[in-house]
Amino acid sequence: MAMLRTDLEFSMLPKLGTRPVRWRIADGLVAYEAAVEMMEREVAAIGEGGDELVWLVEHPPLYTAGTSANASDLVQPDRFPVFATGRGGEYTYHGPGQRVAYVMLDLKRRRQDVRAFVAALEEVVIRTLDMMNVRGERREDRVGVWVRRPEKPLLPDGTMAEDKIAALGIRLRKWVTFHGLSLNVDPDLDHFSGIVPCGISTYGVTSLVDLGLPVMMADVDIRLRAAFETVFGETTNDA
């Protein structure tokens, strides 16, 4: 259960002259196909010099399969719609009560380092959780953000139980990023049982509400934006 080294470099502040990142929050539930179409349009525009964008959404219940997904990890294929996606990673769940942040940035304006970008997304989640007195942690062999659960039984190898609270999956096109992260605020955790989340069966899944924090999505969004700005720089409201 080794943590990543503490000197991990994740700064993704923009170069001088870069315009603020547009910050957009969707109303209601967004169909996955519509989200992908929106990302495709935005990524093309950003690649041509348009302003970068972070888009916060919630989806209806669905599963997505990343480029490394193993068919055997889709335990209940008929439970919810399943979408193949070009992001990295394996199967994951999206649904109401989960904040999905689609992060569309031009790394040529920042730092052309994919590993640092992934670490930066993890850092945004870790700092968001810290504002709510939750300790999120990285793991060397598992992408995402994890929470230790000392109240749960030990794992078979004798180590402390851990649950995943945030998942990451990204894709790049000409150094423009899309897809992003999902943070479990108050989703129905039983919905994760239809898959082996991210191909990892040893560990569970948790949420802020599951951890005893009855937070509202709007409160999480405020903290998420503040954390994002410390890692990626200034944002501006987008219609």
UniProtKB/Swiss-Prot annotation:
The keyword Acyltransferase applies. Residues 48-236 form the BPL/LPL catalytic domain. One of its GO terms (cellular component) is cytoplasm. InterPro entries: aa-tRNA-synth_II/BPL/LPL (IPR045864), BPL_LPL_catalytic (IPR004143), Octanoyltransferase (IPR000544), Octanoyltransferase_CS (IPR020605). It comes from the Bacteria. Its EC number is 2.3.1.181. One of its GO terms (biological process) is protein modification process. Pathway: Protein modification; protein lipoylation via endogenous pathway; protein N(6)-(lipoyl)lysine from octanoyl-[acyl-carrier-protein]: step 1/2. The active site is at residue 198. It catalyses: octanoyl-[ACP] + L-lysyl-[protein] = N(6)-octanoyl-L-lysyl-[protein] + holo-[ACP] + H(+). Keywords: Acyltransferase, Cytoplasm, Transferase. The record marks 164 as: Lowers pKa of active site Cys. One of its GO terms (molecular function) is lipoyl(octanoyl) transferase activity. Substrate binds at residues 87-94, 167-169, 180-182. It is found in: Cytoplasm. Signal peptide: none annotated. Belongs to the LipB family. In the reaction, the free carboxyl group of octanoic acid is attached via an amide linkage to the epsilon-amino group of a specific lysine residue of lipoyl domains of lipoate-dependent enzymes. Catalyzes the transfer of endogenously produced octanoic acid from octanoyl-acyl-carrier-protein onto the lipoyl domains of lipoate-dependent enzymes. Lipoyl-ACP can also act as a substrate although octanoyl-ACP is likely to be the physiological substrate. This is Octanoyltransferase. It comes from Rhizobium etli (strain ATCC 51251 / DSM 11541 / JCM 21823 / NBRC 15573 / CFN 42). The gene is lipB.
